[in-house]
A protein has these predicted regions:
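Glycine-rich beta-strand-turn "strand-cap" elements at beta-sheet edges
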Residues: 4-26, 64-83, 102-134
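A mature extracytoplasmic/lumenal domain signature
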Residues: 13, 47, 71, 89-93
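A short, structured loop/turn motif at beta-sheet edges
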Residues: 18-19, 38, 59-61, 92-96
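Active-site-flanking beta-strand signature of metal-NTP-handling nucleotidyl enzymes
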Residues: 26-36, 86-88
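Short amphipathic alpha-helical segments
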Residues: 40-66
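Short amphipathic alpha-helices within nucleic acid-binding modules
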Residues: 41-45, 91-104
Length: 134
């Protein structure tokens, strides 16, 4: 038996997302969420203008189902205070992402450095859909 000693509640605002592809969710489908800690004032723009195009490319190439970026706008007292945003992903099992968004190695490194310096990513967690109702 599992007994929860605390519940962490976050109210989220959707800031950006790719199109949702692959049809409706079904029992057994998996999604990940990665809590983020904002480290720069332009972090939200970094996700929308650098990360989103990369994930959109993967979606368009049939290698990813969905990516979304949310902001924590409210939380309860038990919730982690440092988490500012959450990134969401639905991967396609067995699909391998393209290595780069940009073919130019220098430009790709600059983009990767900008992403890394703008936020700290906490351990991603996996969710599995276990129930659906009509």
């Amino acid at each position: 038996m599992c007994i929860r000693d605390r519940v962490r509640t976050y109210h989220l605002q959707l800031l950006d997302a790719t199109p949702f592809t692959g049809g409706d969710l079904k029992i057994g489908d998996k999604m990940t969420f990665a809590p983020m800690i904002q480290k720069s004032d332009d972090y939200e723009q970094v996700e929308s203008y650098i990360a989103k195009p990369y994930f959109l490319q993967q979606v368009m190439n049939g290698k990813h189902r969905w990516w979304a970026f949310t902001k924590v706008i409210n939380r309860n007292d038990q919730a982690y205070k440092e988490i500012s945003h959450i990134a969401w992903n639905i991967f396609i099992p067995g699909a391998e992402f393209d290595d780069r968004l940009i073919e130019n190695e220098f430009v790709q490194k600059v983009l990767n450095d900008k992403i890394s310096s703008s936020r700290e990513m906490r351990n991603a967690q996996e969710l599995t859909l276990v129930y659906q109702s009509n």
